[in-house]
Amino acid sequence: LKAQPDGEMKDGFVEVLVKTNGAYEGLSLDMSVLDAAGNTVALDGQYANEDHRTMLRAIVAGADLWSSEHPTLYTLVLTLKNNGAPIEYISTKFGFRKVEILDGVIRINDRRVVFKGTNRHEFDCRTGRYITEEVMRDDLEKMKRANMNAVRTSHYPNCPRWMELCDEYGIYVIDENNMESHGTNRSTIIGCPQIPDSRPEWEKACMDRIQALYERDKNCTCVVCWSMGNESLGGETPKKMYRYLKNVDDTRFVHFECHGDPEEQSLSDVQSKMYAKPQECEEYALTRRDGRPYLLCEYTHAMGNSCGSTDEYTTLWDKYPCLQGGFVWDWVDQSILTKDDQGREYLAYGGDFGDEPNDGHFCGNGLLFGDRRITPKYYEIQKLYQYVDFCAVDPVRGQVEIKNKYLFTDLADFELYWCQCSDKGVFRDGVVEVQLAPGEKVLDLELGRPCNTEFYLNLELRTKEKTLWCPAGFAVAKEQFVIDAFANTYDELVADAPLLVDDTYGSLRGMSDDVNIRFERRERNQLVSIKVGGEELLQGPMRFNFWRALTDNDRGTRAGSRLGCWRDAGDTPGIYNNTKWSIENYKILDGGKKVVVVSGATVCTQPECKGQVIYTITSKGMEVDMQFFPNDALPEIPEVGLLFELPPDFENLTYLGAGPEENYIDRCNATQIGLYNTTVTDLYTDYLKPQECGNRTGVRYATLVGQKKVFSLVAEPVMELNVSHWLPKEIENTWHGKDLPPVTKTVVRCIARQQGVGGYDSWGAHCNEKYKNKTDKTYRLKFQIRF
């Protein structure tokens, strides 16, 4: 079955080659093409041929074309007749679409396409390799809602029903053959060279597989590309597979990741790379063009807390026509839902069943958890894959440029919801029609302007009608513009009553009727107690923190050893790396209404670093002004900030900052500044192997509420905030979330800067240099604690 539009993309041409068995005399074939409403739109009929191969042809005038945006399907009905009497019926659904590579660019229906894709293993934590249709549909709905348009069936043909559903939902499929021989070129076993290469004993098996794939899926409209396999390198056998596909199918291109094979142009129609850095992609676009389009068949390795810097790739796809997208590795964690000896359900991975050898939790690379809950990484991909960009022309006056990146869709099916809001809520909003053909336009919104406050212009492009994959009112694109940033977040602390200062018995205290602040003066020389209304707030001293629970990407860079000097550097005095504090001086100001305590610190790395914290205390609160002066002979710092512990009942959190999902300096495109209400329990992200999670950037202020007490923080101007029930080292040393220690505290990390999470790969790639905490600079963190 071949169904393609004409050169003007108006009429659809369908050709069907039918093979019959047995005697041909008296046999005839009728073909009907039905539209989605069941109307017959084309007919043809032929007598069967002596060679048992009968060609039927028809034209559908004004055909609706199939694409990921508009997956219009027609129904083909074939009737086999014997002397005019029907004896057999066959039907299938299909769409009209054209795939070609023209001038080094992949085009679908005459438009340059960007594959916004993911790799997907067929795996379910409850049923293993068997996937129900319900799960398939759930996957497709989540993919479409994430603005994805493509899937690579890594690394084998998927269930036929999946292919039918991709036709239905509109997903471009890179249909991958089951050939995987990763690593055989590096074998240390004598007599076990690379396979299949040019070895004749493998040729028949490989050819059989590629032929079976083609024959099974040749009529699937969603299949726009054949992939010959995964990481199997070159040789004569792959070349024969490539030539076979080119001979039998001129309607699709062929993909093969050849790993730099010198003859790769005889193996693949596209330049395919895995985990190339953004600069490598751009270098190809600028200097290494070999005439082929460039695809990232795997990129942004989504293992654990990852997917940082993905925006560096998507920006390039918009800039260079030959860079045509990529496929996230991968869609869902391949973990198994099981129970431990205590009957607790958990998602298990390699080694949990006593299996040896195993690959540990390296199966946890998904945008979804194994039980198909959405991870925070998903929302970053959703934002970066969206088809509409909003650019600020003059957001204060409500002038915004909208760029429509859909290929076949104007924006008449959507409406634009906009609102002006601040931390006090929405004060002006509206809905406007946006009827844009693919292109650009500037909108003028009727905005008001609040006085002397930071506010936000939030935009959402929403569907007007329910679709197969989303409800009416679903936001397919979002943007936020921050106006008058930081105008309302920091006021000087009120000092309405004098403090009594007591510097005796090994403690320095600042006290009022309701507040008692105590610094220990014997050994620790740290802030160790904040009592308000007789209630103790601190469960441990306020101290430097330079560590985060290692992420999977951190482990890949050997950060545990490479950056290990920072692991314990912020701890209170001990026998290993720690910080030694001293109270250098204190001053009583404003007639006793203010007490300023200057605390110095020597961080016992090798070589040492210096730090300082200035505490300005009043009866209504305390300002904390931290500076850290690292030694540039030391490696980068995972995190720079202060850590303290509150009682465990401090569970409810309200904050003004980036949200609603966890975010990091290199993974924050999907966030919006807003006032969010959450809990400390919900801030924890249950990655397959516990690791750094729950961070929030751009925090202006935050309030933690306990059973009887309130603890408020106000940043100057912003900080990062991480609140958890566990210390970083407790999280890092746990293999499953179910085994974390019982909750006995609430750990607050006020952070000047945490490093990016990275994501180029998980076996050695660092985060982008600009997201590292270098040691050739000074770090400062300033915030208030309000009583």
Where are the regions that the model predicts?
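Extended acidic/polar, glycine-enriched regions
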Residues: 17-101, 455-499
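Surface beta-strand/loop "capping" patches
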Residues: 1-23, 375-413, 492-512, 626
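Short strand-edge motifs at loop-to-beta-strand transitions and within beta-strands
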Residues: 52-58, 441-445, 779
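An acidic-aromatic loop/edge-strand motif
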Residues: 1-16, 20-27, 90-98, 369, ...
